[in-house]
């Protein structure tokens, strides 16, 4: 008796014997059924033992693509995403009626024949010959399973799908050989199980479990006889027998299956007759896929998780490898999203900014010391229906993660300047003259021994909120009131490099990925950043100087067949950005902003909090970024298109003459954080005593009627960088024109052979 080869295949003699029979049968199938114009020996004439033997001995079976479930930190479902809606189930969890129905209609002799059914071939050949067309196929269930494996392997590549389904001799040869292998290795029960899990049932449902849920909103194990017959009938032509779109045609097909089940003895004729009278009984669950299905307004966070998966090398070295894992699915992704914090964020957003408003808001909360993203939401809902205000642009994140180009943070950047100064040795009670108006200082030192020089010929002047805001000021008062001239004098004193270096240590970088330019205007928040960046940057203060990279994923498991395996996930990396003393000092300064400064409307009552307001040039955006020791959050309000100024505007049903960081974003932050922190421990800051730098009384009432700090109630730039009427001008008054021209490139700078900065150059 010939022996098997060491590789597990048959000997050449055995292969030749099998191939002889297979060739004749396949020739009959292909030539007489699939290609009636070709002679019955067409395949045999083109085939040979050698070509059959050249095929790989083992068929590679790719893991079946399945749905992926994204969970919040408590295990609650956020969304279900998939490339193919499929849930793999064992045969024991499939109704016996379903098992019998699919065998009866697709391959009634399944348990009697091998990989090829000779009787079936001859029967189909005879019927097709009499009808003159392809009326009946002869592929066994095993052969159909093999073909479906090739289709699954092709994925969404149309060329590969066409190759997997094309009616050619080569494909039939390959299909037949692998059918023989599958029969020998798996056995009938496993083949049936695999077939039921891989087959397409229409309506985006792959596999019997997804089909049962789609058409009947129940599990496959609970299907009754008429439901099973309907699903089994769909397989031959999912579009033709689609019960949702053609109930009559689907009913006819179902009844054919029931009749066939009675003919082979699976059910009695009486059962079949009764089942044929029953209505289809559809209870359709509409296909739901992707982050659009996310609950609690977490669609943007869901999309951020997807972006992390597709971009982080931990999930694969190449973009293609990562996409393959994601599209294969079967993943359970446990995220960092805190359901309480997310619910609170969305509630506050909905209360304060309507989705139909001319401007939008985005809010993000992170956990200091871990980098975990706890909440992420915005006023414009996730979706593709632009006419109804939906968008897929994530306003909270950087451009490379599905966001935009960012927004100028205004005076919320000033604490970073203060941190750099303190780290550089500046005392916390440092006093600057801080005049109401001053020329922009020049030169200012930059990195690598360079200097920024303003040689525009028309030096810009900057000014404070109003003419009564005149120094000297120390750091505490200047921070609480966000005095522009104080912070410009500060960066001019310490130089630009320590500030850009500190920003980088805190993870505060431009949303478009460009480097932070070496220009002194960064002290006033001119470089576009995202809310997630600012929230996580301020979390560095809350964690006493430790910066942690943001993370959204806690764990990932993947089901492959009957096994579950854990995947490695990105970890937050933490590093010290500043000393504890510096962080504690900043916390003390920013507590003053909330307690007795421009951010008083954002205060959390008895719970210690700190933060900073900010409003950008021309009021295109307003911010509040704040934190407690256990949560940090950022709220941005503005026009993503950078076209609508927030003067004379209605937001959330309320009219505003001019919008300030403490007036709209501040209350959003307060409500959001109050709900997110409810029930959480009340933690204290490590306060630092900061002695007064000036030993004289200040007129504390002179700015009682100010709307915001830095935010230049005269409609000027960057909290008073460019002046105008500042005597508490009414919101309905026209904005005055600047009293001087602005040097070209003042805010973003230029780079013409070394020139870079506020209309200046490096020397």
Over which residues does each language-model region extend?
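Conserved catalytic neighborhood of penicillin-recognizing serine enzymes
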Residues: 130-155, 289-293, 426-499, 561-592
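Bacterial peptidoglycan biogenesis and beta-lactam-recognition machinery
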Residues: 106-117, 131-137, 182-188, 200-205, ...
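Extracytoplasmic/periplasmic proteins that interact with beta-lactams or build/remodel peptidoglycan
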Residues: 51, 57-67, 72, 136-144, ...
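Peptidoglycan glycan-strand catalytic modules in the bacterial/periplasmic cell-wall system
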Residues: 64-266, 480-483, 492-495
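A penicillin-recognizing enzyme superfamily signal
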Residues: 335-355, 363-365, 376-378, 384-408, ...
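Active-site SXXK
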Residues: 100-103, 107, 261, 345, ...
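Soluble, non-transmembrane domains of envelope/secretory-pathway proteins that act on or interact
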Residues: 1-6, 440-462, 609-610, 614-763
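N-terminal type II signal-anchor transmembrane helix
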Residues: 1-69
């Amino acid at each position: 008796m010939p022996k098997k080869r060491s590789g597990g295949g048959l000997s050449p003699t055995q292969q030749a014997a099998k191939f002889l029979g297979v060739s004749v049968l396949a020739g009959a199938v292909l030539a007489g059924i699939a290609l009636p114009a070709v002679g019955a020996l067409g395949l045999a004439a083109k085939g040979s033992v050698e070509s059959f033997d050249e095929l790989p001995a083992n068929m590679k079976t790719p893991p079946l693509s399945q749905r992926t479930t994204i969970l919040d930190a408590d295990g609650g479902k956020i969304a279900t995403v998939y490339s193919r809606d499929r849930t793999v189930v064992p045969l024991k969890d499939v109704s016996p009626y379903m098992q019998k129905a699919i065998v009866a209609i697709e391959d009634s002799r399944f348990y009697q024949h091998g990989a090829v059914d000779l009787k079936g071939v001859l029967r189909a050949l005879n019927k097709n010959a009499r009808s003159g067309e392809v009326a009946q196929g002869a592929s066994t269930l095993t052969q159909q399973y093999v073909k479906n494996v090739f289709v699954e392997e092709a994925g969404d590549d149309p060329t590969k799908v066409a190759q997997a389904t094309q009616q050619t001799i080569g494909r039939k040869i390959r299909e037949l050989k692998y059918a023989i292998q599958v029969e020998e290795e798996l056995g009938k029960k496993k083949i049936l199980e695999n077939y039921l899990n891989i087959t397409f049932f229409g309506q985006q449902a792959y596999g019997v479990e997804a089909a049962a849920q789609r058409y009947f909103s129940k599990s496959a194990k609970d299907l009754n006889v008429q439901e099973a017959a309907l699903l089994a009938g769909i397989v031959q032509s999912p579009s033709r027998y689609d019960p949702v779109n053609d109930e009559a045609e689907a009913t006819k097909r179902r009844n054919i299956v029931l009749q066939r089940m009675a003919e082979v003895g699976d059910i009695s004729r009486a059962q079949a007759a009764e089942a044929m009278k029953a209505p289809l009984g559809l209870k359709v669950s509409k296909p739901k896929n992707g982050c659009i299905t996310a609950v609690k307004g977490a669609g943007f966070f869901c999309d951020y998780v997807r972006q992390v998966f597709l971009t982080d090398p931990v999930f694969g070295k190449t973009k293609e490898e990562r996409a393959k894992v994601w599209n294969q699915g079967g993943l359970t992704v446990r995220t960092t999203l805190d359901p309480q914090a997310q619910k609170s964020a969305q509630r506050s957003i909905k209360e304060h900014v309507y989705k139909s408003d001319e401007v939008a808001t985005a809010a993000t909360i992170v956990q200091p010391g871990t980098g975990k993203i706890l909440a992420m939401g915005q006023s414009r809902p996730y979706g593709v229906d632009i006419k109804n205000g939906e968008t897929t642009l994530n306003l909270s994140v950087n451009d490379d993660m599905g966001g935009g180009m960012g927004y100028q943070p205004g005076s919320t950047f000033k604490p970073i300047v203060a941190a750099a100064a303190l780290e550089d040795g500046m005392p916390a009670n440092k006093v600057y003259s801080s005049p109401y108006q001053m020329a922009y200082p020049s030169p200012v030192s930059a990195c690598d021994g360079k200097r920024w020089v303003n040689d525009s010929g028309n030096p810009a002047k900057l000014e404070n909120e109003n003419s009564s805001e005149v120094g000297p000021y120390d750091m505490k008062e200047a921070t609480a009131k966000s005095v522009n001239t104080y912070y410009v004098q500060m960066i001019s004193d310490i130089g630009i490099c320590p500030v850009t270096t500190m920003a980088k240590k805190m993870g505060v970088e431009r949303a478009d990925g460009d480097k932070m330019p070496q220009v002194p205007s960064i002290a006033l928040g001119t470089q576009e950043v995202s809310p997630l960046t600012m929230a996580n940057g301020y979390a560095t203060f809350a964690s006493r100087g430790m910066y942690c990279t943001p993370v959204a994923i806690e764990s990932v498991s993947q089901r492959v067949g009957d096994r579950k395996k854990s995947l490695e996930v990105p970890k937050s990396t933490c590093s010290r950005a500043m000393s504890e003393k510096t962080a504690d000092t900043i916390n003390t300064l920013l507590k003053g902003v909330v307690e007795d400064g421009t951010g008083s409307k954002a205060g959390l009552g008895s719970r210690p909090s700190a933060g900073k307001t900010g409003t950008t040039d021309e009021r295109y955006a307003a911010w509040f970024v704040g934190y407690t020791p256990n949560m940090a959050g950022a709220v941005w309000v503005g026009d993503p298109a950078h076209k609508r100024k927030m003067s004379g505007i209605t937001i959330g049903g309320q009219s505003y003459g001019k919008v300030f960081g403490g007036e709209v974003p501040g209350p959003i932050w307060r409500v959001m954080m109050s709900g997110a922190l409810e029930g959480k421990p009340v933690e204290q800051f490590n306060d630092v005593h900061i002695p007064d730098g000036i030993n004289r009384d200040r007129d504390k009432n002179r700015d009682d009627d100010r709307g915001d700090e830095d935010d230049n109630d005269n409609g000027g730039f960057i909290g008073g960088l460019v002046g105008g009427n500042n005597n508490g001008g009414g919101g309905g008054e026209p904005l005055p024109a600047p009293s001087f021209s602005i040097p070209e490139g003042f805010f973003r700078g230029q780079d013409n052979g070394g020139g870079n900065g506020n209309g200046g150059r490096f020397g």
